[in-house]
């Protein structure tokens, strides 16, 4: 029995309709849920990962894509966990095409933000010369989730964040009326403010950001503004 088939069977055994309803409501009824919470889901994944490690190592890209296209959200979370685990420092240059598909398939903040931080951030850390090409493509896309990714992908970069690039993305999207874009701008700036508070403070005070973006950006800087 292959990994995904066994995962499906294991999930059906622990599914809970009672838990599924509030989980679906929390996600604005965007997706169907089996009602499996994080800890038991990851316990099943860990057990089956060890059992099917050879199969997964040989075919994880196809598995991730198959999982993300299943109906229930729990499978999408497994796709996310599997992608982070297997891609780590192991990217091929052409993987950016799959990563873009992952971001734009069954998209919502709970998967996109992790794909942005871990997959896009990790990929561009491994292939830094691709940064401007990839981010320009994402930033100019009509897909809002790719735009959000272009803003958030440096969340794990800490003091190595390219602040000029972050500011350029904020400038490009600062007039957006989309909640998820305004929130991303504030989040990215707030995160970087831990390492460059003066730079973020100066940028926020000199830039006409949307109120939500500004509130999020200065949450840890309000004493200085």
Q: In which residue ranges do the predicted regions lie?
A:
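Alpha-helical scaffold domains
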Residues: 1-225
């Amino acid at each position: 029995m292959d990994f995904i088939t066994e995962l499906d069977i294991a999930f059906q055994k622990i599914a809970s309709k009672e838990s599924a309803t509030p989980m679906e409501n929390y996600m604005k009824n965007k997706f169907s849920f089996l009602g499996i919470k994080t800890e038991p889901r990851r316990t099943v994944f860990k057990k089956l990962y060890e059992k099917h490690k050879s199969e997964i190592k040989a075919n994880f890209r196809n598995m991730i894509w198959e999982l993300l296209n299943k109906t229930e959200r729990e499978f999408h979370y497994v796709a996310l966990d599997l992608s982070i685990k297997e891609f780590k420092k192991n990217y091929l240059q052409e993987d950016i095409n799959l990563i873009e598909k992952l971001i734009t398939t069954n998209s919502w903040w709970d998967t996109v933000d992790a794909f942005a931080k871990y997959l896009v951030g990790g990929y561009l850390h491994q292939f830094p010369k691709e940064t401007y090409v990839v981010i320009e493509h994402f930033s100019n896309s009509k897909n809002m989730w790719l735009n959000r990714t272009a803003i958030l992908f440096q969340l794990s970069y800490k003091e190595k964040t390219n602040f000029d690039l972050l500011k350029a993305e904020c400038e490009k999207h600062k007039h957006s009326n989309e909640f998820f874009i305004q929130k991303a701008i504030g989040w990215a700036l707030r995160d970087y403010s831990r390492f460059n508070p003066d730079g973020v403070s100066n940028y926020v005070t000199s830039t006409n950001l949307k109120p939500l973006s500004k509130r999020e950006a200065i949450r840890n800087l309000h004493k200085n503004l």
